[in-house]
Amino acid sequence: MPEELASRRILIVDDISQNIKVLGEALRGEYTISFAKDGRRAIELAGSETPPDLILLDIMMPEMDGYEVCRELKRHPNTCEIPIIFITAKSDVEDETKGFGFGAVDYITKPINPTIVQARVRTHIELKLHRDNL
């Protein structure tokens, strides 16, 4: 893996520990992984001095769902450019369309295929690197 990809940071946001574990294992060794179990913590980490390069975001979470988190992140100049991939059990076309409407760059339904997650994350990280270098 090219060095510029290995230094990239991924934030996994899900209220279920097992989902975080599965996603973390799929990406471990390729990226620096951090996680949040709720939307407020995700927003805090995304706005930190070392923001993630990409966010994997569940939709169905208590208190603040993934749509609200995405809307909030896209509203602020410091976080609006972070690519967000929804990873969710919500598989209806309406839900997927809604996710893109909130600013997500991709939408993956559970149960996940680790190889597909790896490929999509890599693609969006590479696109972000190209945009950052323009």
Question: Predicted segment positions?
Answer:
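Receiver (REC) domain active-site loop signature in two-component systems and cognate sites
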Residues: 61
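Active-site residues of response regulator receiver
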Residues: 14, 58, 88
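Two-component/phosphorelay signaling modules centered on CheY-like receiver
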Residues: 5, 16-35, 41, 47
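C-terminal output helix
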Residues: 108-121, 125
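Active-site beta3 strand of CheY-like receiver
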Residues: 50-56
